[in-house]
Design a protein with these regions (language model features):
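N-terminal cysteine-rich, zinc-dependent DNA-binding domains of eukaryotic transcription factors
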Residues: 1-40
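C-terminal effector modules of eukaryotic transcription factors
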Residues: 61-70, 76-133, 138-146, 162-178, ...
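Intrinsically disordered, low-complexity regulatory segments enriched in Ser/Pro/Gln/Gly
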Residues: 36-54
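Residues that flank catalytic or metal-binding motifs in active/ligand-binding sites
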Residues: 27, 149, 293
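Intrinsically disordered, low-complexity segments that are common in secreted/host-exposed effector
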Residues: 6-9, 16, 23-26, 167-175, ...
């Protein structure tokens, strides 16, 4: 889908949503898209036409085009590949990390920092209690639960239930498991020296598990453990950032062909009809988890840098994620498909999410988006718009 006439004329980025893009809705503009040949599916040709003299560029398949009119109970044409149907959340630009001046925390305060710590602590407790939270999907580890995240789950559960009598014992447990994770992947005690390459050959689920595990250990060490040896804990921030970059890179090359690690059956073969819908859903879960995990990591490191170095602290940047409520919470592939095919899911960059504050969709954003906006633009300002 091309940009609408209003965005094209103003030379502004268009969200290409139907019936009206986000910019037009927020400004009350008449949103008109260029006429196009009606088609239920947009197939990507194997090669450019021989008569064409122009540079060939395969059409990008967005979520509205991909799922419009699809009955989830019908079998899909097996020629419709996973890569084509998933391109709205797996194309190259969806993995970009973007830094914007908007991400400077000009409205940030110590009150917001305390709110962030409470929020993330609540999310981690939610994961321990229910098996999911806004950046760890309930389906993610339903089939395969890597040892690294098992250890983090155990340490986190102990930490959340600590008492004054056993607190130091549990802090030691967290520290030893954190160091054990680094040792397993070839890092020294400070986490600053690579001893041997251990990232090569890691499967995507192992990338995700070790990043989320180290995130948990770092959160406890940086914000929860008042007696922590901060120089050692801080030195591991660089490892966390490096691992997260490797995770994103692995996802960008793996997800487009389909992620089967969290499917009940991982037998190779053709996927179409209901099986293809299930594969699409699980591939989206993994890709969305990767991007939300990046944003959670970037926020934690950014805020810690803000506390330590002030407003000159570097920011890792943000990634795209779905901002509308209901998509992440869908309990089945069919429910997920119905949501994606009937309305906008609000897939956008963190740096662009501020536009939601001025749109009618503001009251429909999910918890992860709300927290992201509060940390970027201040809780008081965001809550005024949401109310």
């Amino acid at each position: 889908m091309q940009a609408c006439a209003a965005c094209a004329k103003a030379k502004r980025k268009c969200s290409r949503q139907s019936p009206a893009c986000l910019r037009c809705r927020s400004r009350g503009l008449d949103c008109q898209y260029p006429a196009k040949r009606p088609s239920r599916w947009v197939l990507m040709p194997d090669a450019p036409p021989e008569t064409s003299s122009e540079e060939y560029s395969p059409p990008r398949l967005d979520v509205e085009t991909a799922f419009r009119g699809l009955d989830p109970l019908l079998s899909l044409d097996e020629e419709m590949t996973h890569a084509q149907l998933s391109s709205w959340f797996t194309s190259i630009h969806t993995w970009n990390t973007v830094y914007s001046e908007r991400l400077k925390t000009d409205a940030f305060s110590s009150y917001d920092l305390d709110g962030y710590v409470r929020k993330v602590r609540g999310w981690l407790a939610e994961w321990v209690q229910t098996g999911s939270n806004p950046f760890i999907h309930r389906q993610l580890y339903s089939v395969r639960f890597p040892r690294s995240i098992q250890d983090a789950y155990m340490c986190l559960s102990c930490y959340l239930n600590k008492t004054p009598a056993n607190e130091q014992l549990i802090i030691r447990l967290v520290e030893e498991h954190s160091q054990g994770l680094l040792n397993e992947h070839g890092f020294d005690t400070a986490g600053s020296l690579v001893l041997r390459g251990q990232s090569n050959g890691l499967e995507l689920m192992d990338h995700i598990a070790r990043v989320q595990a180290l995130f948990i250990y770092q959160f406890i060490g940086l914000f929860e453990d008042k007696a922590s040896s901060h120089p050692v804990t801080q030195s591991r921030n660089d490892v966390l950032l490096a691992w997260t970059k490797e995770m994103v890179s692995a996802a960008a090359t793996t997800v487009p062909s389909g992620v089967r690690d969290i499917l009940a059956s991982s037998e190779p073969g053709k996927y179409y009809g209901k099986e293809l819908i299930q594969l699409l859903w699980h591939s989206w879960i993994v890709s969305e988890t990767v991007r939300r995990t990046w944003n959670a990591m970037a926020t934690m490191l950014g805020l810690f840098g803000f506390v330590k170095y002030g407003r000159t602290a570097p920011c890792p940047g943000g990634m795209m994620f779905t901002t509308q409520i209901g998509v992440w919470e869908a309990k089945s592939a069919t429910e997920w498909l119905e949501i994606c095919s009937s309305r906008s899911v609000g897939l956008m960059q963190v740096a662009e999410a501020c536009e939601l504050l001025y749109s009618a969709e503001c009251k429909q954003i999910n918890e992860f988006a709300t927290t992201t906006l509060e940390l970027t633009y201040g809780q008081e300002r965001v809550q005024e718009y949401i109310k």
